[in-house]
Amino acid sequence: MALLQIAEPGQSTVPHEHRLAAGIDLGTTNSLIASVQSGNASTLSDDQGRDILPSIVSYQAGNVLVGQTAQALSIEDAQNTITSAKRLIGRSLKDIQSKYPSLPYEFCGDENHPEIMTRQGAVNPVQVSAEILKSLNLRAQAALGGELTGVVITVPAHFDDAQRQSTKDAAKLAGVSVLRLLNEPTAAAVAYGLDSGQEGVIAVYDLGGGTFDISILRLNKGVFEVLATGGDSALGGDDFDVVLVDYLVEQAGLVRPLSPSLERQLMQQACFAKEQLTTKEEVDITISLDSDSDWKTSLTKAQLNKLISSLVNKTLRACRRTLKDADITIDEVIEVVMVGGSTRVPLVRSEVEKHFNKTPLTSIDPDKVVAIGAAIQADVLVGNKPDSDMLLLDVTPLSLGLETMGGLVEKVIPRNTTIPVAKAQEFTTFKDGQTAMAVHVLQGERELVEDCRSLARFELRGIPAMTAGAAHIRVTFKVDADGLLSVSAMEKSSGVESSIEVKPSFGLDDNQISQMIKDSMSNAADDMQARMLKEQQVEASRVIESVQAALLADSKLLNSDEITVIENAIKSLAQVSQGQEIKAIENALDKLNDSTAIFAERRMDSSISEALAGQAVDKI
C-alpha cells in the first residue's frame, strides 16, 4: 500500500533531513556565498581557498570568465570586462552616462534598458549579475555536495523596486531559487545579533564598494526591527577610488579622455593605494603611460584622508538624518556595526567612532558579515531552524500612494513602514455615471503628483453607473518581504477588480531617495498650502457640477430671479477657483451653498411628495 508523506508547509518530509541553503552577498566590488554547516555560518571558498569572488565578468571569444580570471583582463581588455555591474542594475542609460562618464564601455540598447557591447554581443547588467550568481552557485554545490534548495540574496536597503526586481531576474537567469531578498544592514544585524545576543538599538553602518546604507535597528529577544534606513545608493569605496584617480590624473598632468586601459590601470592603482594605506603611512604608485613611459609618485595616509574626507562626512550627515527619522538619539545607540570592505579605511572607522562616541563592532570580517547573516536567514527559511528563533522586520524607504482628483497624492503606506505589509483605503467616483477609474501609483514624500515619482498606472473598468460618491472602490497596496509592490483595486458592490505588479523600467537617480526626503521637509509648508488650494479647487469643481446637474433636472422649482442668483454664484466660484486664493474660494463656496439652500429644500420636498403620492395615510 502506498503511503503519503505529510509535513508542515516549508518543512522537510524527512524529519531530520538538512536542506542545503546559502546566503549570497552580491556586492559591487566583491561577492561571497555562505552557508550554515553543523550550526555555524561560514563563507564558502573556491578550489583555491579563496572566499571572495571579485564582481567582474569578462566576455571572451566563446568563453565567459568570472572573478579573479576576469580581473586579470580588466586592464588589457577593459571594454569586454565589466566591473561594478551592481551600480548599473536597474538604471537608465542617461543616468549611467551622467553619473559614470569615464566607464570604458560601448553602450547600446534603448534608454530604459541599456546594454553593453562586448565581444559576445550586447549584454545587460542583469545578465552580468547572473554570471556572478552562477559562479557562486557552482561553488556552493561543489563545497556542500549537492544542489541548493534556495538562497537569500542581499541588496542595499536603498534599492528600489526596479533594482530589486532586476536582482531577482538575474537569479532566475542563473538558475538560482530565491527564498528572499534581504537588506544588507539587516543581514549584518542577523549575524551579530544571533552570535552575541545583543538587545537594544544598534546602528549598522554599511559602506560597500558602490553603496552606503545606515540602518537603525531595535533588537529584542530575537526580533529585528528596522526603525529607519538612510544612505546613498551611489556612494561607496569606488568613489574613494574615483577621487584618488582624479588626483593622480591631475598630478601626472594627464588630459582626458584617456584610453580605457589607462583608466582601468589608474583605478587599480588607486584601489591598491587605498588598501595599503589601511596599515601603512605612505605608499608608492607607478603608472605605465600610453607613451610607454612610467610615471611614479607617492601618497600618504594624510593626503588620502584629505581627499576622501568630504565623502566620509557625507555618510555621517546621512547618519544624523536617519537617527532623526527613527526618533533615536546617539546616546540610545548601544552598538555600531561596521559592514563592507570600505569600513577598513582608518578615517572611516575613526570618524564613525567619534560620531557615535563608541568603538564600532568589527569582530566579524566586514567583508563577510552580510553573507553570513544571509546564510543564517536562508537556513531558517528552508526549515532547518524554527522560524520562531528569528523575526526580521524591514521597512519601506519612501512613502507609497496614489493620485487623487486635482493632482494630489494620498499616501497609503508611509515611509519607514515595517514590511511585509498590506494596507487598503477606500475611494469613490468623482462624476455621476462614472464606470472606470484610473489608478496612478506614486512614490515620494511630497503632496503633489508632479513632485513624486510615478511607479505604475492601471485602470479599473466595469464600475456600475452611480451618482458621484456612491461607489466604494477599495485600493490595496501590498509590499512583500523583498520590498516589491503590488496594487489592486476592487469595486465593492460588483466585485470587479484590477491589479498590477509594480516593475518600473529603471531605478532611482543617485541620491534621489535622500533628496526626496529632504525636499519634503524643506517644502512642507508650501506643499501643504498647495494641497489645500488643490482640495478647494476640486471641491469647487464638484459643487459646480452637482448644482448644474440639479438645475438641469429641477429648474422648474425656481423662479427666474432665483435661477439668476444661483448662476451668478456659480460663475463667481468658477472664476475665483482659477486663482490662488484659498479664502476667496471658501467664501465663494459658502455663497453658492447659501444661494442654493432654498433650492435644496424644495428638491427634498418634491422628492418626498413623489415618494408619498398615492399612498394611504395608515401605510405611511
UniProtKB/Swiss-Prot annotation:
One Gene Ontology biological process: iron-sulfur cluster assembly
The keyword Hydrolase belongs to this UniProt entry's keyword annotation: no
InterPro entries assigned to the protein according to its UniProt record, in alphabetical order: ATPase_NBD, Heat_shock_70_CS, HSP70_C_sf, HSP70_peptide-bd_sf, Hsp_70_fam, ISC_FeS_clus_asmbl_HscA
Gene Ontology MF terms in the entry: ATP binding; ATP hydrolysis activity; ATP-dependent protein folding chaperone; unfolded protein binding
Top-level lineage group: Bacteria
Keywords per UniProt: ATP-binding, Chaperone, Nucleotide-binding
Function: Chaperone involved in the maturation of iron-sulfur cluster-containing proteins. Has a low intrinsic ATPase activity which is markedly stimulated by HscB.
PANTHER family reported in the protein's UniProt record: HEAT SHOCK PROTEIN 70KDA
Family label: Belongs to the heat shock protein 70 family.
Protein name: Chaperone protein HscA homolog
Lineage: Bacteria, Pseudomonadati, Pseudomonadota, Gammaproteobacteria, Alteromonadales
